Swiss-Prot record:
SUPFAM superfamilies: Ribosomal protein S10 (SSF54999). This is Small ribosomal subunit protein uS10. InterPro entries: Ribosomal_uS10, Ribosomal_uS10_CS, Ribosomal_uS10_dom, Ribosomal_uS10_dom_sf, Ribosomal_uS10_euk/arc. GO terms for molecular function: structural constituent of ribosome; tRNA binding. Involved in the binding of tRNA to the ribosomes.
Amino acid sequence: MQKARIKLSSTQHTELDGVCDQIKAIAEKTGVDMAGPIPLPTKALKVTTRKSTDGEGSSSFDRWTMRVHKRVIDIEADERTMKHIMKVRIPDTVQIEIELRN
């Protein structure tokens, strides 16, 4: 049977966990084997900019950070389960990637 690897990433971990819970509920309802959601390390993207644009005065900086949360779910990919997963409402802040394997 084919397996599907579902990779989810988002900057909002609450919405990401909500989508994972929906996929988990579908797997339990259809009775297929599932592994996950496996939390991957959170990537922190940092940008430091100088507050003063003219170069005069004291050096003060703004520090901006964006955290990217990732989850991986491995699931048996029968037709009925995948059809239900495709109908899940995904928020705009969540990116999803589905890869089918033999």
